[in-house]
């Protein structure tokens, strides 16, 4: 090598250091973007195996009676409005189902944090006992306050307390295939939504209302006992509080004291300061309100426009049956092709559009239209329910999922508490014009849900409101970032 080649070139080191610095900064930015894409954790997931699939089976069996009955709300509302509560107005009866939906969804918060710290068994036992007590007592209900206590509080709260751990155990065992796994577990509720209306319709005629409810209680008992035995968490993913913290102290005390302590800290206020979580929660509130109110009133709508009783029953059955198939297919597409948030956004927008272009103008033109609408709505609706916890998990650590998911559904419960009576008030005495107004309300709320999920996705990928370093206001840049984030797979 020549002496000139051995000499150090002036400025070369400085340029190399500058280039290395730029490269390092670019790498850091890429790392930050990856961190924004998915909430990182240090856990390993089975993605299958005996324990994981038994947990899925346990969740499936638990959802069959608890959420299967939730999907049957329209059948129950229509039946008691014509028999036990025939002299009571629609808006008054709607309070029963408003309390029921509020207790079911709001009581997630009672078990979410407890599951994160201690696992599934105790909240499952507590929730199942409450559910079965209310179910057996329903057979003796004759007054509105009877239904509020037994159906609204006991059945509703029992279902909600059991639901958070049933979803949580799925997230403990699956990450990459979480959408499909959640769909398989929650399809228990969809299948229950097919079986229970048919079962009740037959038993109402043959055995009468009291024994119909008791028979459903006996059937539910077998499913729920198996659920407690099979739905097990992964102990490695239980949240471990810091030494000396309130959670640590309460977890080492008695069950009653620990439950009260967990209850006081179970609502995750800090999470609501995250825009991605806040908009995800708002999207879930709007989506659940729209679909829950639709299930509650679609049966009475069918009877108002003159369709036969069996049509009202079977439309709900078709809706729930198609939710099984649609829920699995859309969850598979979410995991493999499009991303969980993208599918959730499309589903909610389509639910609103179908309401505007199909149910509103043509719902009263023939029962065949409502069967077709029920099939389309069910195919979309099933995947919406399956992906709600998956989207929450997409922006949450797995050891904090129970608390964040239950906080989200506590707010959904409050939305139901106001939304169902509002829907009942819009319907009023039940004229076709009033039902058309409530269809507009349902559809608009679904579209709003899609918009909120879109905003959540944008903030999860990159904050579109982040200011430019050199400008105080950068509206074109903000709009560009928003559009860019909205088009990405997530």
Please report, for each region that a protein language model flagged, where it lies by residue.
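Conserved MFS/SLC helix-loop-helix module at the cytosolic interface between two early adjacent transmembrane helices
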Residues: 106-146
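Hydrophobic core of transmembrane alpha-helices in multi-pass small-molecule transporters
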Residues: 64, 131-135, 145-161, 165, ...
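Helix-to-loop junctions at the C-terminal end of transmembrane segments
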Residues: 106-120, 326-340, 358, 427-428
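Intrinsically disordered, low-complexity terminal tails of fungal membrane proteins
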Residues: 1-49, 233-264, 459-490
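Extracytoplasmic gate region of multi-pass secondary transporters
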Residues: 65, 69-80, 269-332, 341, ...
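Intracellular juxtamembrane helix-capping segments at the cytosolic ends
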Residues: 80, 152, 159-174, 181-182, ...
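A late C-terminal transmembrane helix in Major Facilitator Superfamily
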Residues: 395-432, 442
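C-terminal transmembrane helical hairpin of 12-TM major facilitator-type secondary transporters
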Residues: 305-307, 311, 317-322, 327-329, ...
């Amino acid at each position: 090598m020549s002496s000139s080649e051995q000499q150090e070139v002036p400025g070369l080191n400085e340029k190399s250091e500058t280039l290395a610095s730029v490269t390092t900064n670019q790498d850091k930015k890429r790392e930050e973007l990856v961190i924004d894409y998915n909430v990182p954790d240090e856990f390993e997931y089975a993605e299958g195996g005996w324990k994981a699939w038994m947990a899925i089976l346990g969740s499936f069996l638990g959802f069959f009676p608890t959420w299967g009955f939730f999907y049957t709300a329209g059948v129950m509302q229509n039946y008691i409005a014509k028999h036990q509560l025939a002299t009571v107005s629609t808006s008054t009866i709607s309070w029963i189902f408003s309390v029921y939906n509020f207790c079911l969804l709001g009581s997630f918060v009672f078990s979410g944090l407890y599951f994160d710290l201690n696992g599934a068994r105790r909240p499952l036992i507590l929730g199942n006992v409450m559910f079965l007590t209310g179910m057996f007592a329903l057979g003796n209900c004759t007054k509105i306050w009877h239904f509020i206590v037994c159906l609204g509080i006991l059945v509703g709260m029992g279902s909600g307390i059991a639901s958070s751990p049933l979803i949580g155990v799925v997230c403990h065992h699956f990450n990459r295939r979480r959408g499909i796994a959640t769909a398989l577990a929650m399809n228990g509720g969809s299948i229950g939504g097919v079986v229970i209306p048919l079962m009740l319709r037959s038993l109402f005629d043959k055995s009468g209302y009291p024994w119909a409810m008791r028979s459903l209680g006996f059937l539910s008992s077998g499913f729920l006992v198996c659920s407690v035995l099979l739905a097990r968490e992964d102990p490695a993913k239980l949240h471990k509080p810091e030494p000396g913290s309130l959670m640590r102290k309460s977890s080492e005390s008695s069950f009653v004291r620990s439950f009260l302590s967990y209850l006081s800290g179970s609502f995750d206020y800090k999470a609501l300061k995250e825009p991605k979580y806040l908009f995800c929660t708002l999207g879930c509130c709007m989506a659940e309100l729209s679909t829950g109110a639709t299930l509650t009133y679609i049966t009475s709508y069918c009877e108002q426009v003159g369709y036969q009783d069996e049509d009202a029953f079977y439309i709900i059955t078709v809706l729930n049956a198609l939710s099984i198939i649609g829920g699995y297919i859309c969850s598979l597409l979410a995991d493999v092709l499009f991303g969980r948030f993208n599918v959730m956004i499309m589903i909610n927008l389509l639910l609103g559009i179908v309401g505007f272009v199909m149910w509103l103008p043509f719902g009263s033109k023939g029962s065949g239209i409502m069967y077709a609408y029920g099939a389309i709505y069910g195919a979309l609706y099933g995947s919406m329910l399956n992906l709600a916890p998956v989207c929450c998990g997409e922006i949450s650590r797995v050891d904090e999922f129970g608390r964040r998911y239950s906080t989200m559904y506590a707010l959904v419960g409050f939305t139901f508490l106001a939304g169902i009576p509002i829907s009942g008030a819009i319907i009023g005495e039940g004229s076709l014009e009033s039902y058309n107004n409530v269809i507009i309300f349902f559809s608009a709320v679904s579209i709003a849900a899609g918009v909120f999920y879109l905003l959540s996705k944008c903030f999860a990928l990159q904050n579109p409101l982040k200011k430019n370093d050199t400008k105080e206001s950068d509206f074109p840049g903000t709009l560009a970032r928003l559009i860019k984030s909205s088009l990405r797979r997530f």
